[in-house]
Curated annotation (Swiss-Prot):
S-adenosyl-L-methionine binds at residues 40, 65-67, 90-91, 118-119, 133, 200. This is Carboxy-S-adenosyl-L-methionine synthase. The gene is cmoA. Homodimer. InterPro entries: CmoA (IPR005271), Methyltransf_25 (IPR041698), SAM-dependent_MTases_sf (IPR029063). Catalyzes the conversion of S-adenosyl-L-methionine (SAM) to carboxy-S-adenosyl-L-methionine (Cx-SAM). It comes from Shewanella sp. (strain MR-7).
Length: 243
C-alpha cells in the first residue's frame, strides 16, 4: 500500500471542518495513521496472529471499519486454506475503493466480501473473529453497546473480538502526561504544531474515546467471559474479548 504524505492540515485554515474519511484522507491514510497511532503496525501484525489462533474452518471473519484493508490483509495471510470468508465493511466509498485495490494486489484463496455501508447495519453470524480497529470511537456513544451486543450474538462460542481504541483516563495527571507523550510522538514523526492543533479541532466532535473501564464493563455486560488489554502505548490500546 503506497502512501502519499499527509499534509491535509499543513496550511492554516480559518474554518476547520469535522474530520471525514473522504478522498483526501483515503489518499494519505496509511501515512497518517502510521505517524499518528503509536504501535499501529504491531497491532495490525498481531491481529493476524490472533486470526491464526482463533479462526476456525468454514467460519466468517468481520473487519468492521476496514479502512484501506490493513487488518483484512493481515488476517487473510494467516488463514489460507481454511475455507473461510472475510466480510470487510467501511462507510467511506473512498476507503472502500482503495481497499479493493489493495486487496486485489495480493493473490489469496480466502474470499473477501467488501461492503460500503454502516457497520451498525451488518448482520453478523457464524463468526470466529470480529475486528473493530479504531472504529468504535467514531460511533455515537449511545450506539456502541448495541453494536457490541450484535457482535457477541454473532460470534461462535470461543470466538474472539479484537477492539483497538484511543482511550481516555479519569485520572487527570495520567491523562495529561500520556496525551503529551502522544503529541511528542506526532512531533517526532514530522507533524507541526499547526497540523496537530488543526487535526485535533477536526476530530473534536467526531471521535469520543471511552475509558478502559467503560470498554470492559460494556464487553462483560454483553456476556463476554474473558477480557484483556493486550496492547497499550500512551493513550492508544487494543483489547481482546472471548465469547
Amino acid at each position: 500500500m503506497n502512501a502519499s504524505q499527509d499534509t491535509i492540515y499543513a496550511q492554516a485554515s480559518e474554518h476547520i471542518s469535522d474530520f471525514q474519511f473522504d478522498n483526501r484522507v483515503a489518499g494519505v491514510f496509511s501515512d497518517m495513521i502510521r505517524r499518528s497511532v503509536p504501535g499501529y503496525t504491531q497491532i495490525i501484525n498481531t491481529i493476524g496472529d490472533f486470526a491464526d489462533r482463533f479462526v476456525k474452518p468454514n467460519t466468517q471473519v468481520y473487519d468492521l471499519g476496514c479502512s484501506l484493508g490493513a487488518a483484512t490483509l493481515s488476517i487473510r495471510r494467516q488463514i489460507q486454506g481454511r475455507d473461510c470468508r472475510i466480510i470487510a465493511v467501511d462507510n467511506s466509498e473512498s476507503m472502500v475503493t482503495r481497499c479493493q485495490e489493495n486487496l486485489s494486489a495480493y493473490v489469496s484463496d480466502t474470499e473477501v466480501e467488501l461492503i460500503c455501508g454502516d457497520i451498525r447495519d451488518i448482520h453478523i453470524e457464524n463468526a470466529s473473529l470480529v475486528v473493530l480497529n479504531f472504529t468504535l470511537q467514531f460511533l455515537p456513544p449511545e450506539d456502541r453497546e448495541a453494536l457490541i451486543a450484535k457482535i457477541y450474538y454473532g460470534l461462535n462460542p470461543g470466538g474472539l473480538l479484537v477492539l483497538s481504541e484511543k482511550i481516555r483516563f479519569d485520572d487527570a495527571p495520567i491523562q495529561s502526561v500520556l496525551e503529551e507523550l502522544h503529541l511528542d510522538f506526532k512531533r517526532a514523526n514530522g507533524y507541526s504544531e499547526l497540523e496537530i492543533s488543526q487535526k485535533r479541532s477536526a476530530l473534536e466532535n467526531v471521535m469520543k474515546p471511552d475509558t478502559l473501564s467503560i470498554h470492559q464493563q460494556r464487553l462483560t455486560g454483553q456476556g463476554f467471559s474473558h477480557f484483556s488489554l493486550w496492547f497499550q502505548c500512551f493513550n492508544f490500546s487494543s483489547m481482546v474479548a472471548i465469547k
